[in-house]
C-alpha cells in the first residue's frame, strides 16, 4: 500500500515537472509594493506546487540609473569695456604773423572829362515831346489864369452877396443886379474843367478875403459893389490891392483860417447848387495857395 502511494506521488511529480518545463512562466512586472497584486494572474501550476518545491524567480534586473545631467557650462565672463585712450595733448595755436606796415594808398589820378557822346535821335525826339507837353501845360495854365482873373469876378460878388446877407450888412445888391451876376458866374464855371473847379472856388474865397482886407485898411474909400454893366465886360475888378499890404497875394495866414473856412463853406453851398456844377469833395478839406486871381 505504501509503495502504491509512493509510485502515485512520483507519477504526479513527474507529470507536474514536465508541464512546468513546457509552460513559460511570465516575468513578474515591478509593481508598487503598496498596490495589491491581482489574484487571477497567478498560474494554476504554481498553486498546485507543494511547499518547499517552488521555483525561484529570476533576479529582477535593476532599474537603469538615470544619466546625470550634463554639467552646466559656466557663463561667459563679461569682457571689460576698453579703457578710453587719453586725448593727445593739444597743440598750441599758431601765433598770427605780425601785421605788415600798411602801404600808402595810391593817390587818385585826376580824371579828365570824357567827351559827351552825341544824343541819339530817339532821345532827342523824347526830349522834344516832353518840351512840347510842358509848353502845352503852361499855355493851359495861362488860359486858366486869364479866365480866373477876368471871369470869376461875378462868382466873387455872388458869394460876397450871400456873405453880407448872412451877416446882415448894408451892402446888398438889388435883385435886378444879382440875377445877371448869377448868370455870368454859372457861364464861367461851366467853361472851367472839373479838375480846376476846386482851384477856382479857392480863388473866389481868397478874392473875398482880400476885398474885406482892403475895406478894413481904407474905410474912407468908396469900395463897394458896382454895377455889372460897367465892370464885367472889360474884365476889370472891383478893387485895387493895396501896395502897402505885402500879403495881398500869397498863402492864407493862420489868423485868416477861420474866415477862410467860413467863406469857403458858403461858396461850396451856393455855387454848385446855383449853377448845377460838380465840385470835387476834396475842395472842402484842402487849401490851395492863391495869387492866380489878379485884379487890375
From Swiss-Prot:
Composition skew (Low complexity), residue ranges: 37-58, 117-126, 220-241
Posttranslational modification: Substrate of transglutaminase.
Keyword Glycoprotein: no
MF terms (GO), sorted A to Z: nutrient reservoir activity
Region feature Disordered, mapped onto this chain: 24-126, 220-255
Signal peptide limits: 1-20
Note from the entry: The alpha/beta-gliadins can be divided into 5 homology classes. Sequence divergence between the classes is due to single base substitutions and to duplications or deletions within or near direct repeats. There are more than a 100 copies of the gene for alpha/beta-gliadin per haploid genome.
Similarity-based family: Belongs to the gliadin/glutenin family.
Protein's name in the database: Alpha/beta-gliadin clone PW1215
Native organism: Triticum aestivum (Wheat)
Amino acid at each position: 500500500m505504501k509503495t502504491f502511494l509512493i509510485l502515485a506521488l512520483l507519477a504526479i511529480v513527474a507529470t507536474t515537472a514536465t508541464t512546468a518545463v513546457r509552460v513559460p512562466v511570465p516575468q513578474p512586472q515591478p509593481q508598487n509594493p503598496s498596490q495589491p497584486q491581482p489574484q487571477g494572474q497567478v498560474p494554476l501550476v504554481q498553486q498546485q506546487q507543494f511547499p518547499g518545491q517552488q521555483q525561484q524567480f529570476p533576479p529582477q534586473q535593476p532599474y537603469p540609473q538615470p544619466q546625470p545631467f550634463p554639467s552646466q557650462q559656466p557663463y561667459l565672463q563679461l569682457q571689460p569695456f576698453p579703457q578710453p585712450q587719453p586725448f593727445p595733448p593739444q597743440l598750441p595755436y599758431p601765433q598770427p604773423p605780425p601785421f605788415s606796415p600798411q602801404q600808402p594808398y595810391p593817390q587818385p589820378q585826376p580824371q579828365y572829362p570824357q567827351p559827351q557822346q552825341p544824343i541819339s535821335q530817339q532821345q532827342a525826339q523824347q526830349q522834344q515831346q516832353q518840351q512840347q507837353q510842358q509848353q502845352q501845360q503852361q499855355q493851359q495854365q495861362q488860359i486858366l489864369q486869364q479866365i480866373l482873373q477876368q471871369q470869376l469876378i461875378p462868382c466873387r460878388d455872388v458869394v460876397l452877396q450871400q456873405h453880407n446877407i448872412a451877416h446882415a450888412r448894408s451892402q446888398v445888391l438889388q435883385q435886378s443886379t444879382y440875377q445877371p451876376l448869377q448868370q455870368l458866374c454859372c457861364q464861367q464855371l461851366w467853361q472851367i474843367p472839373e479838375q480846376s473847379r476846386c482851384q477856382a472856388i479857392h480863388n473866389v474865397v481868397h478874392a473875398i478875403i482880400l476885398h474885406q482886407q482892403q475895406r478894413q485898411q481904407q474905410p474912407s474909400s468908396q469900395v463897394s459893389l458896382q454895377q455889372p454893366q460897367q465892370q464885367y465886360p472889360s474884365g476889370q475888378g472891383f478893387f485895387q490891392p493895396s501896395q502897402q499890404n505885402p500879403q495881398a497875394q500869397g498863402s492864407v495866414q493862420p489868423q485868416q483860417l477861420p474866415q477862410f473856412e467860413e467863406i469857403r463853406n458858403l461858396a461850396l453851398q451856393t455855387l454848385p447848387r446855383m449853377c448845377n456844377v460838380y465840385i470835387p469833395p476834396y475842395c472842402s478839406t484842402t487849401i490851395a495857395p492863391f495869387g492866380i486871381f489878379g485884379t487890375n
